[in-house]
Amino acid sequence: MRGRTRIGKFTTCGERNPKKVARTQPTKKDLKTQNPILHSDQGWLYQMVGYQAILRENSIQQNMSRKGNYLDNNAMENFFGRLKTECYYDKRFETFKQLKKQLMSIFIITTMITFRGN
């Protein structure tokens, strides 16, 4: 990826239903950019034809790193690695709402640090 990488929208979904997860993804209009890219791992959900079709309908390009190769999209892999380390590993959540609150708190902190650094 060339140019600046930024997170245009951050969403969460408490289910592993491909259609519901795909519907939580931002649209091109939401992102206010010409060429939005969604970065994900190679999980089964992201490889499903229905999920990929919904992304195409919304003009969102899907980007997946090759298995075991974090260098394909170092910026996003680094972000997700940090996110998991700081708010997921070694923690227990009773509800999805608690996990979502933790994710949003780290997202806000990361965004503030990024803007201060620019």
Curated annotation (Swiss-Prot):
Keyword hit for Transcription: no
Superkingdom field: Bacteria
Record keyword DNA-binding present: yes
Transmembrane regions listed in the UniProt entry: none
Pfam families referenced in this protein's UniProt entry, alphabetically: rve_2 (PF13333)
GO process terms (BP): DNA integration; DNA recombination; transposition
PANTHER family: TRANSPOSASE INSF FOR INSERTION SEQUENCE IS3B-RELATED, TRANSPOSASE INSO FOR INSERTION SEQUENCE ELEMENT IS911B-RELATED
Protein name, per record: Uncharacterized transposase-like protein HI_0493
Organism name: Haemophilus influenzae (strain ATCC 51907 / DSM 11121 / KW20 / Rd)
